[in-house]
Amino acid sequence: MVNIPKTRRTYCKGKACRKHTPHKVTQYKKGKDSLSAQGKRRYDRKQSGYGGQTKPVFHKKAKTTKKVVLRLECTVCKTKHQLALKRCKHFELGGDKKQRGAAISF
């Protein structure tokens, strides 16, 4: 279980800052695939008409987790940069902190 706070003081590369400032932390999410990308246009053209599936469908999945990517936004100049963490099964953003000597509950 990885628990990351919602704010973090870290270095800002923005031209206005170039120093340590508070950053707002969010989790990176993949955007929607563009229908006008060259590969998608080619694939759709190839798929149309008779002949079934024309390219191999990938089945040999090897990884069980994805790397968590944090999106850090500077609260001063609004510059954004990304930071990759290690792989983990459970990721939490801004969850409760662990208490010393507290009983474990599931």
UniProtKB/Swiss-Prot annotation:
Coiled coil: none annotated. It comes from the Eukaryota. GO terms for biological process: response to antibiotic; response to cycloheximide; translation. Keywords: Antibiotic resistance, Cycloheximide resistance, Ribonucleoprotein, Ribosomal protein. InterPro entries: Ribosomal_eL44 (IPR000552), Ribosomal_LSU_eL42 (IPR053708), Ribosomal_zn-bd (IPR011332). One of its GO terms (cellular component) is cytosolic large ribosomal subunit. Cycloheximide sensitive type. This is Large ribosomal subunit protein eL42. It comes from Cryptococcus neoformans var. neoformans serotype D (strain JEC21 / ATCC MYA-565).
